[in-house]
Curated annotation (Swiss-Prot):
Binding site for GTP: 16-23, 63-67, 125-128
Family: Belongs to the TRAFAC class TrmE-Era-EngA-EngB-Septin-like GTPase superfamily. Era GTPase family.
Alphabetized Pfam families for the sequence: KH_2, MMR_HSR1
Region (G2): 42-46
Keyword GTP-binding: yes
Location(s) in or outside the cell: Cytoplasm; Cell membrane
Chain segments carrying region G3: 63-66
The organism of origin for this protein: Lactiplantibacillus plantarum (strain ATCC BAA-793 / NCIMB 8826 / WCFS1)
Keyword vocabulary terms for this entry: Cell membrane, Cytoplasm, GTP-binding, Membrane, Nucleotide-binding, Ribosome biogenesis, RNA-binding, rRNA-binding
Ranges for region G1: 16-23
Region (G5): 154-156
Taxonomy of the source species: Bacteria, Bacillati, Bacillota, Bacilli, Lactobacillales
Record's protein name: GTPase Era
Any GO BP: ribosomal small subunit assembly
Entry GO CC: cytosol; plasma membrane
Length: 302
């Protein structure tokens, strides 16, 4: 009888400044969108867990909010959420952009990584956007910052070197159980992912002052008939002046947000969806603990 192959499992944190491609890498690894992507800072607000499973390995990736200097209770929640993962994982991926020089934000994170005992990998993203000589300059800027386990230049968007990174991480994980079923790619409920897909479209389509003031609450999900799933959601904003931006002339912007979000939600659920969106003004919600909790930002969950 052939000896059964040992199963390896563990947890990997993805950490870095806002907009370095953490969510793009997570989605690439699991093969489906579980974390929203945008060129706006602070896109990810919760720790998103993506699950990568093969015949002999299960890696649970935690995509943290981008670390930045907080300016509100929500910002404080995001940074605490990111830093709280570091002592609980088997490996840490510190992601940077190949097309950006090392700055104060990177040094802020590096200082906090100095106390981490787990192996830390420097992952240099967006190598498809720079000349190889520039990549060497970036590597030189970081080479002595921390005792890196390894340095991996990748393109999360194109997939360059991502498989090689996964192979290396597999060797880092201890023998352990399979925590989740093989076909499960995230531990977040569908409601959360649907709300994030809607928020992603708000981030993509609205002007700079709106995205940071936006939350999305799923009011109901139910099968309306044999053909469609009926989703009702409310887009929360902070100021009345933002309501007109979200709705648009004659409702054009809200319709566009709904149309693009519905497409992604249908892909997620594998079914036809009727999406009904509302817009509500809730002043200063980012600094109100009761509202943060009701919108899904609970510090005690982290």
């Amino acid at each position: 009888m052939a000896e059964q192959q040992a199963f390896h499992s563990g947890f990997v944190a993805i950490i870095g400044r806002p907009n370095v491609g953490k969510s793009t890498l997570l989605n690439r690894v699991v093969g489906q969108k579980v974390a929203i992507m945008s060129d706006k800072a602070q896109t990810t607000r919760n720790r998103i867990q993506g699950i990568y499973t093969t015949a002999d390995t299960q890696m649970v990736f935690i995509d943290t909010p981008g670390i930045h200097k907080p300016h509100s209770r929500l910002g404080d929640f995001m940074v605490k959420s990111a830093l709280s993962t570091l002592g609980e994982v088997d490996a840490v991926l510190f992601m940077i952009n190949a097309d950006e020089r090392r700055g104060a934000g990177d040094n802020f994170i590096i200082d906090r990584l100095k106390t981490v005992k787990q192996p830390i990998y420097l992952v240099i993203n967006k190598i498809d956007q720079v000349h190889p000589d520039h990549l060497l300059e970036i590597m030189d800027q970081y080479k002595d910052a921390l005792p890196w386990k390894e340095v991996y230049p990748i393109s999360a968007l194109e997939g360059n070197n991502v498989d090689e990174l996964l192979t290396t991480l597999k060797g880092q994980l201890p023998e352990g159980p399979q925590y989740y079923p093989s076909d499960q790619i995230t531990d977040h409920p569908e409601r959360f992912i649907i709300s994030e897909l809607i928020r992603e479209k708000v981030l993509e389509l609205t002007r700079q002052e709106v995205p940071h003031s936006t939350a999305v609450v799923i009011d109901s999900i139910k099968r309306q008939d044999e053909e469609k799933i009926h989703v009702q959601a409310t887009i929360i904003i902070e100021r009345s002046s933002q309501k007109g931006i979200i709705i648009g002339k004659g409702g054009s912007m809200l319709k566009k947000i709904g149309s693009l979000a519905r497409r992604d939600i249908e892909h997620l659920l594998g079914d036809k969806v009727y999406l009904e969106l509302w817009v509500k003004v809730q002043e200063n919600w980012k600094d109100r603990q009761d509202l943060l909790a009701s919108y899904g930002y609970r510090q005690d969950d982290y």
